[in-house]
């Protein structure tokens, strides 16, 4: 579904939504409309959409998380037995820190023989780079993508290197991220963004981070250390 802007859903993605009998959208609560659903409704009627509760933010209790996943997988399996084609909408790309990968494994076990296809999507880091003007990579520069939920140490190790570092899901650890950027001398060129393409969009220099919590899905780009001139690393 892309990062949230309905105009960034690919043509192939739109076709998949329209060709499906039902479209499953992941939510934390059946009464809450998530970002994936809000995007989907630009392309299919509401009666075609089915909300399924996933443990999207459950990190404290593995047993409860696995039970929630089993329940969600069971619900999607029911839909697959009742319909020829079921689409699952996920923001970003289905193979990048996505709910979809876990669901696909569950469905493969519950409904053997199900043909599972994925449609690539535009990621938040691509959208933030385009909107902020931050260049993700040049020449031989490496690119490291880190979920801040993995811990501040992992982020600091990435920032200590020469390449571009992208941090996902850093909103709740904004203070720790700002400290890591300052300690590694990477804060001046870094930029963060949230709700990209939506009315509440925010794109700011990382130097403005003041320790206040940000939206969970906030994304940060710390560009590579670039000393040479144009084309110097080709």
Regions found by a protein language model. Name each.
Residues 62-71, 131-134, 158-161, 203-209:
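Short, surface-exposed amphipathic charged segments that create phosphate/polyanion-binding patches used
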Residues 81, 158-234:
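A contiguous loop/helix-start segment that scaffolds small-molecule binding in enzyme catalytic cores
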Residues 68-78, 134-147, 209-219:
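A polyampholytic, Gly/Pro-enriched intrinsically disordered region
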Residues 4, 28-31, 54-56, 122, ...:
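Short, acidic/turn-prone active-site loops that include or flank metal/cofactor-
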Residues 1-6, 11-115, 178, 200-204, ...:
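Class I S-adenosyl-L-methionine
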Residues 21, 84, 133, 162-163:
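Residue-level detector of structured alpha->beta connecting loops
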Residues 49-51, 116, 145, 190-192:
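Conserved beta-strand scaffold positions in the cores of enzyme catalytic domains, especially
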């Amino acid at each position: 579904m892309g990062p949230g802007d309905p105009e960034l859903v690919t043509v192939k993605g739109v076709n998949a939504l329209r060709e499906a009998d039902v479209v499953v959208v992941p939510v934390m609560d059946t009464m809450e409309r998530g970002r994936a659903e809000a995007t989907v409704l630009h392309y299919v009627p509401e009666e075609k959409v089915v909300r399924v509760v996933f443990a999207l933010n459950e990190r404290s209790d593995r047993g409860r998380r696995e039970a929630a996943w089993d329940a969600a997988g069971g619900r999607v399996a029911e839909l697959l037995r009742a319909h020829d084609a079921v689409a699952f909408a996920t923001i970003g790309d289905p193979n990048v820190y996505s709910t979809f990968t876990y669901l696909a494994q569950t469905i493969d076990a519950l409904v053997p023989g199900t043909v599972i296809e994925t449609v690539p999507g535009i990621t938040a880091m691509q959208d933030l780079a385009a909107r902020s003007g931050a260049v993700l990579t040049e020449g031989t520069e490496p690119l490291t993508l880190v979920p801040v939920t993995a811990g501040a140490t992992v982020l600091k190790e990435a920032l200590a290197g020469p390449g571009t570092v992208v941090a996902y899901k850093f909103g709740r650890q904004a203070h720790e991220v700002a400290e890591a950027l300052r300690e590694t001398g990477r804060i001046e060129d870094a930029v963060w963004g949230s709700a990209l393409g939506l009315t509440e969009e925010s794109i700011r220099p990382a130097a403005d981070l003041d320790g206040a919590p940000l939206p969970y899905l906030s994304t940060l780009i710390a560009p590579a250390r670039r000393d040479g001139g144009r084309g110097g690393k080709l």
